[in-house]
C-alpha cells in the first residue's frame, strides 16, 4: 500500500551524527535560537483561505491558481461523466444483456476518468477513491476495481516541508525534537505519512505521523466540490442513492484530520481492553497536535503475512479467533466504541514481547485510530438480537429486528437476508452457519446473483439503509475477509458462533439492567434475574460447544 521515495538532502537544519552509522538523520545537540513567529489569522467568508492558517508562507494568488485548476478538473470530469451516463441510460437496447454491457462499459470509462482526476488532485480525492474501492457492497465493481489502484499511489511530503510543519505547529524543528529522524517514511497514505524517530536525549524510538500540509489547505474546497458533484448527480439522476456518501465524507474527514482525536481514540481503546485477557496491543501515545501524532514505535508484520506467522509458529486460526473477539467486543461491549477501518494495513502481528499480558505467543497490534463511531446502546441490543435470530433462524423475530435495525420492509426481507449472510434466503434453514465454504461455491453463488439481477437489488437496498447499520455490517464483512486472507482451517462457522456469544452477553446485560432499574419487588427481580442468568449460561455453553465442534471438525477430521 505504501510507497517509498527519495528525499532531498537538507543541510540547513541538521547534519550527520559522526559517531553512529544509521539510515536516520542525527541532529546536533546544540540548541538553536529561533525567532518567534505567528500563525496567520485568516478570517473571512472564504472557506479555502481558512485552511491556510497552518501555513506561514501562504500565497493567496498561487493558491487561487492551484484551487482553480483543481476545481476545473473536477467540473470537467463531472460533465463528461454526466453526459456519458445520460447517453447510455437514455438509449434503447435490443436486450437487457446489451443494456447491462453498455452500462458496464460506461461505468468503467467514468471510473477511469475519475481516477485520473483523483490522482492529479491528490489529498482527500485519493481518500475518497480508497473509500470507493472498499464499497463493493454499494457501487458497481467497475468503480471499485478501478479505485483499488489508489491504495498504493499516495504522494509524499518532503523532509523540508515536514520540518516546516513542526516549526509552525510546535515552535520547534525536527532537530530540536528528535535526535534521529528516518528520512524514509515507514508508510505514506492519502492524508499523512509515518516516520521512525528517536526522541531527544533518549533511547526511545517512536513512530511520528505527520499530516500532508496541502491537505488542510485544500480540504475545504475539495469538500465543497465533492458535495457539488453529488448534488449535480442527484439533479440529473433523481434515483441516485449515494448522497449519503458526501455526508459521510464531510463528517469523517474532519475527524481524520485531527490527530488529537486519533490520540484520544487510541487511549480509550487501550484502556477498554486493559482489563480483558486479549492478544490486542494498542501503541502508547506520547503526545499529539492536530497535525502531528507521536506514538510508541511497534515493529510487526501485516496481518496477512502468512510466511511470518509460519516462521514464528503463530496459529492463523487463533489469530482469526482473536480478531473476531476484538471487533465483536468493540461492537457489543460497554460503550460501543468501534474502529471503523480494520483493513490488513491497519492490523499488525508480532511475536509476544517480554512483559506482555497476551495469553498467546503473539500480539495483534491495532493502528490508525483516526475514525471511530460510537454505537448507541439501543442499536447494540437490536443488532445483537437480529444476529441471534439469524443464527437460530427465527423468521418472525428476524423480520422485526431487520426493520428496527435496517428499516427493511417485509418485501425486501429476502434480499436483506441474502445480503447479510452471503447465502440464498431459501437455504438459511438448511446450510451450516457461515455460507458457502469453498471458493467454487462462492463463485457459483455470485454468478447466480448477477444473472438473476439480485446483485443490483442488494446494492439498491444497502444504499437506503442507515449509515451506522451499514458500517456495522461492513465491519463484520471485513472480519470475515481477514479470516479468508489468513487461509484458516477451522471454518467460517466459528466467526458467527463467537459473535453469537457477544450478542448473548449484550442482550443479557440489557435485560439485567432493565430488571434492576424497574419498580418490581425484589423477590420478582431475584427470580427473573436467576432465570435470565441460567438462560444466558445455557445458550452461551451451547454456542461454545458448537464452536469447539466445528473447530475440531475442520482442523482434525
UniProtKB/Swiss-Prot annotation:
Entry annotated with the keyword Cytoplasm: no
One GO cellular component term: mitochondrial inner membrane
GO BP annotations listed: lipid homeostasis; mitochondrion organization; phospholipid homeostasis
InterPro entries the record matches: ABC1_dom (IPR004147), ADCK1_dom (IPR045307), Kinase-like_dom_sf (IPR011009), Mito_struct-func_regulator (IPR051130)
Pfam family, one: ABC1
Locations listed in the record: Mitochondrion inner membrane
Transmembrane keyword on record: yes
Any one GO molecular function term: kinase activity
Transit peptide: 1-33
Family, as annotated: Belongs to the protein kinase superfamily. ADCK protein kinase family.
Protein name per UniProt: ABC1 family protein MCP2 homolog
Organism, scientific name: Schizosaccharomyces pombe (strain 972 / ATCC 24843)
Amino acid at each position: 500500500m505504501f510507497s517509498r521515495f527519495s528525499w532531498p538532502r537538507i543541510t540547513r537544519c541538521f547534519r550527520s551524527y559522526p559517531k553512529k552509522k544509521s539510515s536516520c538523520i542525527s541532529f546536533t545537540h546544540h540548541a538553536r535560537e529561533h525567532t518567534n513567529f505567528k500563525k496567520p489569522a485568516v478570517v473571512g467568508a472564504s472557506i479555502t483561505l481558512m485552511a491556510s492558517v497552518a501555513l506561514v508562507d501562504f500565497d493567496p494568488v498561487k493558491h487561487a491558481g492551484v484551487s482553480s485548476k483543481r476545481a476545473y478538473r473536477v467540473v470537467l470530469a463531472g460533465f463528461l461523466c454526466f453526459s456519458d451516463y445520460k447517453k447510455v441510460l437514455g438509449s434503447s437496447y435490443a436486450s437487457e444483456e446489451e443494456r447491462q454491457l453498455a452500462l458496464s462499459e460506461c461505468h468503467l470509462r467514468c471510473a477511469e476518468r475519475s481516477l485520473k482526476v483523483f490522482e492529479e488532485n491528490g489529498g482527500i480525492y485519493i481518500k475518497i477513491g480508497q473509500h470507493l474501492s472498499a464499497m463493493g457492497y454499494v457501487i458497481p465493481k467497475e468503480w471499485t476495481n478501478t479505485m483499488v489502484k489508489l491504495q498504493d499511489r499516495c504522494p509524499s511530503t518532503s523532509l523540508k516541508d515536514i520540518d516546516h510543519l513542526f516549526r509552525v505547529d510546535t515552535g520547534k524543528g525536527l532537530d530540536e525534537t528528535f535526535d534521529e529522524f528516518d528520512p524514509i517514511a515507514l508508510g505514506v497514505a492519502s492524508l499523512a505519512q509515518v516516520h521512525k524517530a528517536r526522541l531527544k536525549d533518549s533511547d526511545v524510538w517512536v513512530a511520528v505521523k505527520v499530516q500532508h500540509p496541502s491537505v488542510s489547505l485544500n480540504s475545504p474546497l475539495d469538500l465543497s466540490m465533492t458535495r457539488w458533484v453529488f448534488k449535480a448527480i442527484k439533479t440529473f439522476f433523481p434515483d441516485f442513492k449515494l448522497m449519503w456518501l458526501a455526508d459521510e465524507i464531510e463528517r469523517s474527514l474532519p475527524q481524520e484530520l485531527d490527530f488529537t482525536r486519533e490520540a484520544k481514540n487510541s487511549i480509550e481503546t487501550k484502556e477498554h481492553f486493559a482489563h480483558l485477557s486479549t492478544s490486542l496491543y494498542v501503541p502508547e501515545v506520547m503526545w499529539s497536535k492536530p497535525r502531528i501524532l507521536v506514538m510508541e514505535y511497534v515493529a510487526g508484520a501485516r496481518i496477512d503475512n502468512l510466511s511470518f506467522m509460519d516462521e514464528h509458529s503463530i496459529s492463523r486460526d487463533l489469530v482469526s479467533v482473536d480478531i473476531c473477539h476484538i471487533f465483536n467486543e468493540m461492537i457489543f461491549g460497554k460503550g460501543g466504541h468501534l474502529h471503523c477501518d480494520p483493513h490488513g494495513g491497519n492490523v499488525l502481528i508480532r511475536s509476544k514481547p517480554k512483559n506482555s499480558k497476551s495469553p498467546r505467543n503473539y500480539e495483534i497490534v491495532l493502528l490508525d485510530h483516526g475514525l471511530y463511531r460510537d454505537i448507541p446502546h439501543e442499536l447494540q441490543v437490536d443488532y445483537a438480537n437480529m444476529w441471534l435470530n439469524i443464527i437460530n433462524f427465527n423468521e418472525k423475530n428476524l423480520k422485526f429486528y431487520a426493520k428496527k435495525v435496517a428499516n427493511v420492509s417485509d418485501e425486501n426481507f429476502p434480499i436483506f437476508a441474502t445480503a447479510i449472510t452471503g447465502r440464498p434466503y431459501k437455504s438459511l434453514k438448511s446450510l451450516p452457519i457461515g455460507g458457502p465454504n469453498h471458493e467454487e461455491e462462492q463463485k457459483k453463488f455470485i454468478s447466480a446473483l448477477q444473472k438473476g439481477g439480485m446483485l443490483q437489488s442488494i446494492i439498491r437496498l444497502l444504499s437506503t439503509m442507515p449509515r451506522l447499520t451499514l458500517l456495522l455490517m461492513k465491519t463484520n464483512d471485513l472480519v470475515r475477509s481477514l479470516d479468508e486472507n489468513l487461509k484458516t482451517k477451522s471454518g467460517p462457522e466459528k466467526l458467527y458462533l463467537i459473535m453469537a456469544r457477544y450478542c448473548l452477553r449484550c442482550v443479557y446485560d440489557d435485560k439485567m439492567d432493565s430488571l434492576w432499574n424497574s419498580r418490581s419487588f425484589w423477590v420478582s427481580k431475584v427470580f427473573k434475574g436467576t432465570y435470565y442468568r441460567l438462560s444466558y449460561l445455557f445458550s452461551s455453553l451451547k454456542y461454545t460447544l458448537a464452536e469447539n465442534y466445528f473447530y475440531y471438525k475442520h482442523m482434525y477430521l
